């Protein structure tokens, strides 16, 4: 049976509301240490790989992609029932189920950092964009902030759900192409990623007016963060399109 609490009860706890025993995982030492450590690791690994040949990571990538597909599917399916509770679950009640799966989603952001490690070992330096590093160095920190302040709940479920659903599609694509197959829907996947950011911007814009459980600063944080992601992703997509066009032009000369 689902367990619910009023949002005000969770605010007063100033910690995970239903699972306080997990607070250690969203402590400042973990939040700051893990994300600063990520940036330091990127710098060290890139320097270490400078004079080394690219490594064959095919088997590891296959295991990694399958793991990501499985975890993303479980999170998306587990959070999906809350989609029926109104638009973005605005003013939705705080539940143990949402908090648990948002915590799992938060933990998955640390697994996502392995994307960067794989890119560096494979010497895919063109993929190590500012957008990529910025996203991985910040998204887990933001989810951790929500959880440690007792508001990783309610309408916040939507961000975790839509991101899990998109990640399921993304890692399915990566697995498919790693097996040597071509995905004709790759361009659609890019549009889906951008639509995800757009939906989160809409949610953050509506929350101050239709959700009285979230303080304005949290909606503002989500709004500004997803606007930066949308702009950076749009710029990266535009530049990638230009580079692809130049490569195609050279091949026809």
Curated annotation (Swiss-Prot):
Q: Which InterPro entries match?
A: ELO_fam
Give the protein's function.
Answer: Involved in the synthesis of fatty acids. Elongates C20 polyunsaturated fatty acids (PUFAs) with a preference for n-6 PUFAs.
Entries under PANTHER family matching the protein: ELONGATION OF FATTY ACIDS PROTEIN, FATTY ACID ACYL TRANSFERASE-RELATED
An example molecular function term from Gene Ontology annotations: fatty acid elongase activity
* Name of the featured protein: Fatty acid elongase 5
> Organism, per UniProt?
Trypanosoma cruzi (strain CL Brener)
Record field: catalytic activity: an acyl-CoA + malonyl-CoA + H(+) = a 3-oxoacyl-CoA + CO2 + CoA
Q: Where does it reside? A: Membrane
Top EC class for this record: transferase
The alphabetical list of record keywords is: Fatty acid biosynthesis, Fatty acid metabolism, Lipid biosynthesis, Lipid metabolism, Membrane, Transferase, Transmembrane, Transmembrane helix
Assigned protein family: Belongs to the ELO family.
Q: In which pathway does it act?
A: Lipid metabolism; polyunsaturated fatty acid biosynthesis
In chain numbering, where does the motif HxxHH motif fall? 132-136
Please indicate which superkingdom the organism of origin belongs to.
Eukaryota
Encoding gene per record = ELO5
């Amino acid at each position: 049976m689902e367990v619910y609490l009023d949002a005000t009860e969770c605010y007063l706890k100033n910690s995970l509301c239903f699972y306080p025993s997990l607070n250690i995982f969203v402590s400042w030492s973990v939040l700051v240490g893990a994300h600063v450590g990520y940036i330091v690791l990127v710098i060290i690994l890139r320097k270490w790989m400078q004079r080394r040949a690219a490594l064959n990571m095919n088997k590891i990538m296959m295991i990694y992609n399958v793991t990501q597909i499985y975890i993303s599917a479980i999170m998306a399916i587990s959070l999906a029932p809350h989609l029926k509770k109104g638009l973005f679950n605005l003013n939705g009640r705080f539940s143990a189920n949402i908090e648990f799966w948002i915590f799992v989603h938060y933990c998955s952001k640390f697994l996502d950092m392995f994307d960067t490690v794989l890119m560096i070992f494979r010497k895919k330096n063109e993929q190590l964009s500012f957008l990529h590093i910025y996203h991985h160095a910040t998204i887990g920190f933001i989810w951790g902030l929500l959880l440690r302040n007792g508001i990783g709940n309610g309408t916040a479920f939507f961000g975790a759900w839509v991101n899990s659903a998109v990640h399921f599609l993304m890692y399915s694509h990566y697995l498919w192409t790693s097996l040597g197959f071509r995905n004709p829907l790759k361009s659609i996947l890019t549009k889906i990623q951008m639509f995800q950011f757009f939906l989160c911007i809409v949610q953050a814009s509506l929350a101050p007016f239709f959700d009285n459980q979230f303080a304005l600063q949290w909606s503002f944080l989500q709004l500004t963060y997803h606007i930066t992601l949308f702009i950076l992703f749009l710029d990266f997509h535009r530049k990638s399109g230009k580079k692809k066009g130049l490569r195609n032009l050279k091949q026809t000369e």
